[in-house]
Amino acid sequence: MTTATVNATSNVPDTKLGRLYEEHIRLILAKDIEAILDQYTDDAVLISSFEKKPRYFRGRKQLREHFQGILGIEGLESKIAFWAETQNPETLMVVEAIAMQTADGEASMRFADSWVLKGGKIAIHFAGMTQYPDGSVA
């Protein structure tokens, strides 16, 4: 199992949402799906473009299905290219340059994540791929 460190992220602000984001990345590296799910509301919705078509995941059971994909990640570095957050409502928009190790080798891509929080937990998560590992742009 990969050892998670805060060094997996760079350029993350020292804010409440910055700490939640760093914890999210740490939990991904630790492959702790249950703890990741605890960051979400029970009725959370995640919309993903990772597969070049929209996928919708609603509730804990479907979110678990989405996060099963992290089990193949052996390393992850996230460098923040853009960060914006608000406090009321509590929201986050982040664009990340990602490098990771998978069973197929090293992959580099760009993600764009947006979170809407309710009660300190993620209620809506837009998980978008903006540049795929093959270099194509979404």
Model-derived features: positions:
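Short, mixed charged/polar active-site loops
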Residues: 54-56, 106-110
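Short beta-strand edge/turn micro-motifs at domain boundaries
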Residues: 108-138
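Short beta-strand segments enriched in hydrophobic/aromatic residues
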Residues: 40-41, 98-100, 128-129
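Short, cysteine-centered beta-strand-loop-beta hairpins and adjacent loop/turn segments enriched
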Residues: 73, 100-108
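Short beta-strand segments that buttress and anchor functional surface loops
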Residues: 67-68, 94-103
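Short, low-complexity N-terminal intrinsically disordered segments enriched in polar/charged residues
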Residues: 1-38, 42, 136-138
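A solvent-exposed, acidic/Ser-Thr-rich amphipathic alpha-helical stretch
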Residues: 14, 33-90
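Hydrophobic/aromatic beta-strand elements that line small-molecule binding cavities or substrate pockets
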Residues: 79-85, 97-99, 110-116
